[in-house]
């Protein structure tokens, strides 16, 4: 089984509120279908979640009743986005079912709690594809908090022990230098903590590298014996399919020891 996350930058236009990239999602769903692999899909929020969550400081927890309308709107927007993704998966012939994180699980001081994964395991055993997503989740300490798609990925990794974890993004992977400003920047095919430290020293443009670095940290925590974590560019047609079928594509891999 393979755990796949569609990043928000792939499935939406992050610069425009509630802008869904339907054609790209349709193609990615078909690539998953054509791989003949059993997968669990998680997706990020993109422009459906981040804008309102940031404007209303939702990740700081419950501070004031004035936040509640924003909580409701973000939850509505995320379920709307999820419904569109689930539809594309089903249209591609994949039996996908929504599992809303905020309706099914709790957090404790921003840490996702899935004490009883029986329902998720039962769905997988019956050939149903659960689709989870970043969401506003009730928090026992903070009242509520934002649960990211990456947090869900880490928790599902411990539950299902997948053979591979794939993060689908809008970039080829981690570079040794900022590729936007340096034509000699090289894609780093294999990353470990020492490599990541050297990249942090060489690259200083935080707004360009911060998201990639955070993703690499997540991948390094998740990779384990028999399970590599891969960051691949989903904006390029065929890359995800080739990767899932065992082919070589431009990407960055955190290899399990």
Identify the role of each PLM range:
Residues 1-40:
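N-terminal glycine-/serine-/threonine-rich phosphate-binding loop
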Residues 5, 119-154, 193-210:
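Catalytic-site beta-strand/loop segments enriched in glycine and acidic/polar residues
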Residues 6-9, 42-46, 232-234:
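Glycine-rich beta-strand-to-loop/alpha-helix junction loops that act as flexible
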Residues 10-12, 46-51, 104-107, 137-139, ...:
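Short, active-site-adjacent cap segments at secondary-structure transitions
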Residues 24-28, 70-86, 143, 151, ...:
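Polyanion-binding loop/helix "lid" in catalytic or ligand-binding cores
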Residues 46-62:
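Glycine-rich loop at the start of a catalytic domain that most often binds anionic cofactors/ligands
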Residues 57-137:
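Ligand-binding beta-strand-loop-alpha-helix segment within the catalytic cores
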Residues 159-184, 231-238:
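Acidic, metal-binding active-site segment of PIN/NYN-like and related structure-specific nucleases
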């Amino acid at each position: 089984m393979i755990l796949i996350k569609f990043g928000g930058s792939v499935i939406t236009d992050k610069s425009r509120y509630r802008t869904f990239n339907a054609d790209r999602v349709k193609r990615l769903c078909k690539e998953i279908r054509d791989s003949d692999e059993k997968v669990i899909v998680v997706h990020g929020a993109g422009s459906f979640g981040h804008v309102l969550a940031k404007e209303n400081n939702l990740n700081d927890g419950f501070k004031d009743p004035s936040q509640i309308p924003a909580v409701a709107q973000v939850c509505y927007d995320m379920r709307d986005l999820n419904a569109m993704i689930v539809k594309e998966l089903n249209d591609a012939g994949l039996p996908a079912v929504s599992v809303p994180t905020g309706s099914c699980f709790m957090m404790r001081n921003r840490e996702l709690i899935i004490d009883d994964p029986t329902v998720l395991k039962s769905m997988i055993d019956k050939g149903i594809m659960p689709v989870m997503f970043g969401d506003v989740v009730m928090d026992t300490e903070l009242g509520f908090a934002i649960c990211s798609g990456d947090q869900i990925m880490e928790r599902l990794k411990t539950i299902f022990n997948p053979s591979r974890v794939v993060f689908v993004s809008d970039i080829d992977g981690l570079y040794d230098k900022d590729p936007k400003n340096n034509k000699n920047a090289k894609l780093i095919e294999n990353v470990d903590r020492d490599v990541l430290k050297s990249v942090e020293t060489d690259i200083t443009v935080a707004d360009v590298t911060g998201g990639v670095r955070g993703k690499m940290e997540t991948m390094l925590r998740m990779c384990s014996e028999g399970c590599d974590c891969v960051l691949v560019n989903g904006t390029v047609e065929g890359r995800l399919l080739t990767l899932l079928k065992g082919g070589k594509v431009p990407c960055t891999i955190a290899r399990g020891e």
